[in-house]
C-alpha cells in the first residue's frame, strides 16, 4: 500500500480552499447574460468553446492533490445541480464558493464548525420555503419561451423553438436535441406513437414516391412471438378481408412461408397488409406491445396468458386512423384506445420512473410516456461551424432542462433577485447559539453572491447593484443585459424555482461538509524508480575489454 500524505486543521483547509477557488473562478465567469466564454482544450479535434458551467467544471483536474480534492467537491455541486434540474450549475458553484470562503473565515476565527454547519442548514431550509412562496406558475407559452431564452444566454430563438415544441407535444411529450444540417434551427414533430422498426418487406410499399406504407383505418394485430406458419394467420386474414380494411401485423418477427404469403396477398390486392417487428427487446418489448395495445384498443396475443393466434377475432385487434411505415420507423396515428385506459397506463409508467434507479431506464420510460400521452419533437440545432454547433447544442439542452423545471415547480424572478428576497425574509432567523447565528449570516451573505457575480461579469459595480436591489421589493431587480432596473417578471427574466432551489441546497450541502473538514489524506507521489546500476567495478570482469 502506498504511503500517505496527511494534512490537518488550517493547513488542510487552506489547500482545499485554493482548489475550490480555482475551479469556481473558472466556472463563474460564464454566469449571466454577459458571462464570458471558456475555451476547453481537447485531446483530439478542435477546442470546445462553452458557457455551460458544468462542462467547464468537468474539465478541471489540479496537480496538487489537496487542492484537487477541494476542486472535485465543488465539481460535485455542479454535477448534482445538473442532474436534479439540468441547469443552475454555475449558480450552485458560485453559492458553494461563497459559503466555503465565508465559513472557513469563521472557522479560522475559532468558531465551532459543526454549529456553523447547523446554522447554514437552518438558513437554507428557511430560504427554500421562501422560494416556494415566491414561486409563480409557468403555464403559458410566453413564459416558457422567456425561461428558455434566459437559460440559453439570452438567445430568443432558442427560447421560442423550445416553447413551440412544448406547445405541440404537450408537457409530457419527449423533446430531443440533435445536431442539424442547416444553418438555422429546425423543429420536427412526430404526432402519434412512433417506434424504430420499419417494414419487413419492401413489397408492402404502396406509396412509391415516399417509399412508405400508408394504411388508412387499419386493424392492428399484436403478437408476442415469431410467426412462420401462415395457417395461424388465416382466420385473422379472412375476417379482415371480409371487413374490407387493411391489416398491420406487429410481432416479434414474421418470416418464411408466413411473410411470403402476406406479400403475395398484398400484391394481388386480396388483403392490404403490412408487417413490422415489435419494438424493443425482452421485457421492454412486452411492455411496449402492451402500450400499443392500450393505445389502439387491442389485445396482445400471447401464449403466456392463454391466447392463441388461430382463435383471434376482430374484437382482439387494435384500430387506428392511420399508420405510416418507412424503412426505419412505424408511426401509429390516432389510436382507438379509451382515454381512461391510456391515462391509467401513463400513471403506471410514471410510478415506474419514480422507482427507477438508472438514468437509461428513466429515459426509456419517459419516452414511453411521451409516445402514449403526446408526441415526440426533435430540435435540430443549426450552426455555421462544428465548434459553434457543440456550444449551441449545450445551450439548447440547458434551456430545455430549465423549461421543464419551470413547468414542474414554477418560476421566480431571475438575475439572483429571488435569493436576495428569500434572504431578506429570514434576516431575523436565529439559531440555538451564537455560532449557529454566524452560520445563518454566512448563508445569507452567500445568497448575494449570484447577483454580484452577474453584475461583475457585465462590467458593473456589484455592491451598488446589490444594495439597490435589496432596497427594492418583490421582483424588482437589475437587468444586466440592458443595465436597467425594473420588474424582472415583466422584463421576462425568470429562473425556474427548481433550478434556484436545487442550486442553493446542493451548494450548502457540499460546502457544509468542507467547512467541517479537519484532516485530508492523499497518496504521496511515487518516486521515480532508479535506472540500471553502473556495471563498472563488478568483480571478475576486469579482463573484458571494449572493442
Curated annotation (Swiss-Prot):
Enzyme class: isomerase
Major site of localization recorded for this protein: cytoplasm
One GO MF term: ATP-dependent protein folding chaperone
Location in the cell: Cytoplasm
Ligand binding (ATP): 30-33, 51, 87-91, 415, 479-481, 495
Keyword Nucleotide-binding included in the entry's annotation: yes
A Pfam family this chain is assigned to: Cpn60_TCP1
Gene Ontology CC entries for this record: cytoplasm
Keywords: ATP-binding, Chaperone, Cytoplasm, Isomerase, Nucleotide-binding
UniProt cross-references to CDD domains, sorted A to Z: GroEL
Enzyme Commission code(s) on record: 5.6.1.7
UniProt xrefs under InterPro entries: Chaperonin_Cpn60_CS (IPR018370), Cpn60/GroEL (IPR001844), Cpn60/GroEL/TCP-1 (IPR002423), GroEL-like_apical_dom_sf (IPR027409), GROEL-like_equatorial_sf (IPR027413), TCP-1-like_intermed_sf (IPR027410)
Biological process, per Gene Ontology: protein refolding
UniProt family annotation: Belongs to the chaperonin (HSP60) family.
Role according to the record: Together with its co-chaperonin GroES, plays an essential role in assisting protein folding. The GroEL-GroES system forms a nano-cage that allows encapsulation of the non-native substrate proteins and provides a physical environment optimized to promote and accelerate protein folding.
Oligomer status and interactors: Forms a cylinder of 14 subunits composed of two heptameric rings stacked back-to-back. Interacts with the co-chaperonin GroES.
Protein name: Chaperonin GroEL 1
Origin species: Vibrio parahaemolyticus serotype O3:K6 (strain RIMD 2210633)
Gene encoding the protein: groEL1
Amino acid at each position: 500500500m502506498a504511503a500517505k500524505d496527511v494534512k490537518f486543521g488550517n493547513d488542510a483547509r487552506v489547500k482545499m480552499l485554493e482548489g475550490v477557488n480555482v475551479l469556481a473562478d473558472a466556472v463563474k465567469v460564464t454566469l449571466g447574460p454577459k458571462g464570458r466564454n471558456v475555451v476547453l482544450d481537447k485531446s483530439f479535434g478542435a477546442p470546445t468553446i462553452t458557457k455551460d458551467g458544468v462542462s467547464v467544471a468537468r474539465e478541471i483536474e489540479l496537480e496538487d492533490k489537496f487542492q484537487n480534492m477541494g476542486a472535485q467537491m465543488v465539481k460535485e455541486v455542479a454535477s448534482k445541480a445538473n442532474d436534479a434540474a439540468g441547469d443552475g450549475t454555475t449558480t450552485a458553484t458560485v453559492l458553494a464558493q461563497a459559503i466555503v470562503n465565508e465559513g472557513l473565515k469563521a472557522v479560522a476565527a475559532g468558531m465551532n464548525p459543526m454549529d456553523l454547519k447547523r446554522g447554514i442548514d437552518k438558513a437554507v431550509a428557511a430560504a427554500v420555503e421562501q422560494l416556494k412562496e415566491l414561486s409563480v406558475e409557468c403555464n403559458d407559452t410566453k413564459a416558457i419561451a422567456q425561461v428558455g431564452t434566459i437559460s440559453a444566454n439570452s438567445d430568443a430563438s432558442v427560447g421560442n423553438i423550445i416553447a413551440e415544441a412544448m406547445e405541440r407535444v404537450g408537457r409530457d411529450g419527449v423533446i430531443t436535441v440533435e445536431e442539424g444540417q442547416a444553418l438555422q434551427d429546425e423543429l420536427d414533430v412526430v404526432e402519434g406513437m412512433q417506434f424504430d422498426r420499419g417494414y419487413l418487406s419492401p413489397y408492402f410499399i404502396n406509396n412509391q414516391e415516399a417509399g412508405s406504407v400508408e394504411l388508412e383505418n387499419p386493424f392492428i394485430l399484436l403478437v408476442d412471438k415469431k410467426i412462420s406458419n401462415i395457417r395461424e394467420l388465416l382466420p385473422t386474414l379472412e375476417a379482415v378481408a371480409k371487413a374490407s380494411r387493411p391489416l398491420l401485423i406487429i410481432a416479434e418477427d414474421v418470416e418464411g412461408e408466413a411473410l411470403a404469403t402476406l406479400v403475395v396477398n398484398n400484391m394481388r390486392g386480396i388483403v392490404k397488409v403490412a408487417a413490422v417487428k415489435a419494438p424493443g427487446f425482452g421485457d421492454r418489448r412486452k411492455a411496449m406491445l402492451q402500450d400499443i395495445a392500450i393505445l389502439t384498443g387491442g389485445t396482445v396475443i400471447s401464449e403466456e396468458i392463454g391466447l392463441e393466434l388461430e382463435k383471434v377475432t376482430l374484437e382482439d385487434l387494435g384500430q387506428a386512423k392511420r399508420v405510416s411505415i418507412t424503412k426505419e420507423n412505424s408511426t401509429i396515428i390516432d389510436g382507438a384506445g379509451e382515454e381512461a385506459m391510456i391515462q391509467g397506463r401513463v400513471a403506471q409508467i410514471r410510478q415506474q420512473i419514480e422507482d427507477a434507479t438508472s438514468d437509461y431506464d428513466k429515459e426509456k420510460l419517459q419516452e414511453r410516456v411521451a409516445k402514449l400521452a403526446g408526441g415526440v419533437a426533435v430540435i435540430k440545432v443549426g450552426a455555421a461551424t462544428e465548434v459553434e454547433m457543440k456550444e449551441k447544442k449545450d445551450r439548447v439542452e440547458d434551456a430545455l432542462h430549465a423549461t421543464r423545471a419551470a413547468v414542474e415547480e414554477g418560476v421566480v424572478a431571475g438575475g439572483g433577485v429571488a435569493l436576495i428576497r428569500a434572504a431578506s425574509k429570514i434576516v431575523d432567523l436565529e439559531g440555538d447559539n451564537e455560532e449557529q447565528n454566524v452560520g445563518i449570516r454566512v448563508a445569507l451573505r452567500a445568497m448575494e453572491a449570484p447577483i454580484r457575480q452577474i453584475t461583475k461579469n457585465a462590467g458593473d459595480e456589484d455592491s451598488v447593484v446589490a444594495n439597490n436591489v435589496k432596497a427594492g421589493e418583490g421582483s424588482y431587480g437589475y437587468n444586466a443585459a440592458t443595465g436597467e432596473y425594473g420588474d424582472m417578471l415583466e422584463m421576462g427574466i425568470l429562473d425556474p424555482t427548481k433550478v434556484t432551489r436545487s442550486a442553493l441546497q446542493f451548494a450548502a450541502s457540499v460546502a457544509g461538509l468542507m467547512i467541517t473538514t479537519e484532516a485530508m489524506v492523499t497518496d504521496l507521489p511515487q518516486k521515480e524508480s532508479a535506472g540500471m546500476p553502473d556495471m563498472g567495478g563488478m568483480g571478475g570482469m576486469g579482463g573484458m575489454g571494449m572493442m
